[in-house]
Amino acid sequence: MTELSRIRNFSIIAHIDHGKSTLADRFIQICGGLTDREMAEQVLDSMDLERERGITIKAQSVTLNYKAKDGETYKLNFIDTPGHVDFSYEVSRSLYACEGALLVVDAGQGVEAQSVANCYTAIEQGLEVVPVLNKMDLPQAEPERVAAEIEDIIGIDASDAVRCSAKSGLGVEDVLEDLIKKIPPPKGDRSAPLQALIIDSWFDNYLGVVSLVRVTEGVLRKGDKIVIKSTKKAWNADKVGVFNPKPTDTDVLEAGDVGFVVAGIKDIHGAPVGDTIVHQKFAEETPMLPGFKKVKPQVYAGLFPVSADDYDDFRDALEKLTLNDASLFFEPENSDALGFGFRCGFLGMLHMEIIQERLEREYDLDLITTAPTVIYEVVTKQGETLSVDNPSRLPDIGSIEEMREPIVEANILVPQEHLGNVIALCEEKRGVQKNMHFMSTQVQLTYELPMAEVVMDFFDRIKSASRGFASLDYHFVRFQSANLVRLDVLINGDRVDALALIVHRDLSHRKGRQLIEKMKELIPRQMFDIAIQAAIGTQVVSRVTVKALRKNVTAKCYGGDVSRKKKLLQKQKEGKKRMKQLGNVEVPQEAFLAVLKVDN
């Protein structure tokens, strides 16, 4: 039993590639969590996908015992958090379980926009933020400049920040000592009735729902009768323990601890994230803990199984993923071109890619994705306001009074030498500059941009415009009236609902032309001409034709009368005419994805 004064709960805030997962590896090694043989790089990034892309997607937790220099043994609960902007809600959930956070900054690169955003989240939640300068072994490390930058941008004193190199292990023990000194111990009363917050849950095929919890009051023991507050259902706590990093049964979790609980819950919605676990006998009087605010999806796309037989498996897979990823939203949808599927809401393009890859890998599904769109507000002539997340559900142009698109405020940090390129890119994306602040080597830009322009490929474009040095963080501000139209794609006169886009009227001609040129390359040639048109309402803005293949029907006539050849050609002509009436064109999967790549 560890006293509260010797427990420290903390997480690490860092930008992508600033060495957060490597630092976690060093902590685990120093505290003897794993033997050297079991030590893999990035132990906590357990998903294959996380390792391949080198990013952290899911929050993980580890409990370590560290013998400090004052002779005491401290229990460190460390919760790993993602650094990418699409996963910022994962970060805020992890921070709920902590009293402090390490802000890890690369001493060569300096502060990045996402660390700033996550750092503010931590400060808002009342956490103690301890700055750490990492990658001190690199020749380009400039700790003095970066410390000044942390002070300038974030406003926390970094003059005595610990300097370390997670890769070589230099100074990592000093980080642990500093953390014990500066981060306060958890508060909580172990004799009070149980209250535990569910930080994360995932589905295990053998155990059912496994929940990661932070106990705030009381004690949770194996065999206790527990109640999940929102569902009011009672369960038996079958397994209780901690991750160090392997799951280890401890049979008891006390106030201040972070660990897991398995209660044989087989229903996926049985233990929602952000819920409170209490003891059955005090279930009525124990209040709920303040949970997390629900995040609203920013980007919507249709996902359809390639074969219709997979529809049920697809639904089960989505349900299991929503348990693990609270921000994923889905509802059934059917499309004339693609059959039955789901309309899913994501936090951003990276989130969408990750979810699609997880569905294809972990659940073995083949999926087709339609072009992602953001939510638009439409005011009709009757004065009612609709939210539209699917271009094919847009009302008729004649009945629309005005359309409003979502606007985001983007904070961009960019080195001065790349400022021109980044400003040019923001202007091209219909951005409005709000602020510009020069710091030692970087410039902080604030722009208001249409969300539709940001979610598509803005992140990649801004990285390439600045050679990878710019960083971006954005949040939704408001809906604003704009001149928007629906761009339809017609193939042989038939509208393909899955290819519709909502675009700004000024860009519609260019976008329409680019899109159908792209489609022309991807649709295979048939025995008849295929007309591909881009239209706004009834007005066609551009058209291309995929030429027919010609079969030489007169090849078998050696010499002979010309009327024989005419007869064969006439017969072919009639056949083509009939084929054109009945023939339908298969649109390949690549063509649906062409819509995403139109800008480039």
Swiss-Prot record:
Its lineage opens with: Bacteria, Pseudomonadati, Pseudomonadota, Gammaproteobacteria, Pseudomonadales
The GO molecular function terms of this record are:
GTP binding; GTPase activity; guanosine tetraphosphate binding; ribosome binding; translation elongation factor activity
Q: Which CDD domains match?
A: EF4_II, EF4_III, LepA, lepA_C
- What sections of the protein cross the membrane? none
Keywords (alphabetical) are: Cell inner membrane, Cell membrane, GTP-binding, Hydrolase, Membrane, Nucleotide-binding, Protein biosynthesis
Where, per UniProt, does this protein localize?
Answer: Cell inner membrane
Which gene underlies this protein? lepA
Q: Which cysteines are joined by disulfide bonds?
A: none
Which segments constitute the tr-type G domain? 5-187
User: Per its UniProt record, what HAMAP family does this chain match?
Assistant: LepA
Briefly state the protein's biological role.
Answer: Required for accurate and efficient protein synthesis under certain stress conditions. May act as a fidelity factor of the translation reaction, by catalyzing a one-codon backward translocation of tRNAs on improperly translocated ribosomes. Back-translocation proceeds from a post-translocation (POST) complex to a pre-translocation (PRE) complex, thus giving elongation factor G a second chance to translocate the tRNAs correctly. Binds to ribosomes in a GTP-dependent manner.
Matching entries from InterPro entries are given as:
EF-4, EFG_III/V, EFG_V-like, EFTu-like_2, G_TR_CS, LepA_C_sf, LepA_CTD, LepA_IV
Q: Classify the main location.
A: membrane
Q: Name one GO cellular component term.
A: plasma membrane
Q: Name one GO biological process term.
A: positive regulation of translation
Reaction(s) catalysed (UniProt annotation): GTP + H2O = GDP + phosphate + H(+)
Q: What is this protein called?
A: Elongation factor 4
Broad class of enzyme this protein falls into = hydrolase
- Known EC number(s)? 3.6.5.n1
What is stated as this protein's family in its record? Belongs to the TRAFAC class translation factor GTPase superfamily. Classic translation factor GTPase family. LepA subfamily.
One Pfam match, given by its short name, reads: LepA_C
Query: Which residues are involved in binding GTP?
Result: D17, H18, G19, K20, S21, T22, N134, K135, M136, D137
Task: Identify its membrane topology class.
Answer: Peripheral membrane protein
